[in-house]
């Protein structure tokens, strides 16, 4: 990414301002090169909220992934827990736009991460609904265990311990 500022300076401003995808990627570059400036995160998030309908869906997927990674790698992993709420919102947006599904399936790691973040922000009802709605999008051989284990996790956070025990007895290790 060295020298990117010099390249950007040579692109006519009118082109940058009128091209949504180029603008989005320029903001993403700033997000990567100056991670301490949260403003770039919010700027890209706002641009996507307003203009994602005019951007190719593959580009939208990539740009939301940049936002998600920023929340995780630059903020949460460095102790900025405020970004759990942001990460949760990004996951919700990605789900609503079906950006996390590949051939109708959700990667088990994404499923787990969404649940973990949802529980962290205490969105228990939402997480329970997510589990019920998306477990069938996991590989078939993982569905029943994922359902039982993750529902038990929700019930644990809700202090419904008898349900936790009941569900954990059904989990195969």
Annotate each language-model stretch with its function.
Residues 112-122, 131-172:
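Alpha-helical adaptor scaffolds
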Residues 80-84, 124, 161:
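TPR-repeat structural position
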Residues 1-33:
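Flexible inter-repeat linkers and adjacent short helices
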Residues 23-29, 66-70, 109-113, 146-157:
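"A position-specific structural signal for the A-helix of alpha-solenoid helical repeats
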Residues 9-17, 49-61, 92-105, 132-143, ...:
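Solenoid-like repeat scaffolds
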Residues 73-74, 82-104, 111:
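Acidic, serine/threonine- and glycine-rich low-complexity intrinsically disordered segments
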Residues 29-34, 73-77, 116-120, 154:
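Residue-level signature for tetratricopeptide repeat
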């Amino acid at each position: 990414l060295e020298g990117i500022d010099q390249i950007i300076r040579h692109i006519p401003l009118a082109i940058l301002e009128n091209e949504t995808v180029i603008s989005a990627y320029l903001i993403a570059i700033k997000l990567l090169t100056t991670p301490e400036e949260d403003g770039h995160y919010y700027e890209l998030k706002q641009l996507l909220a307003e203009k994602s309908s005019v951007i190719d869906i593959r580009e939208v997927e990539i740009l939301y992934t940049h936002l998600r990674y920023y929340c995780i790698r630059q903020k949460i992993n460095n102790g900025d827990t405020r970004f759990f709420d942001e990460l949760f919102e990004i996951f919700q947006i990605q789900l609503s736009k079906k950006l996390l599904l590949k051939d109708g399936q959700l990667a088990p790691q994404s499923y787990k991460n969404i649940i973990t973040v949802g529980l962290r922000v205490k969105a228990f009802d939402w997480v329970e609904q997510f589990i019920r709605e998306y477990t069938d999008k996991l590989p078939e051989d993982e569905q029943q265990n994922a359902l039982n284990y993750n529902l038990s996790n929700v019930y644990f956070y809700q202090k419904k311990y008898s349900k936790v025990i009941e569900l954990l007895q059904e989990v195969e290790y």
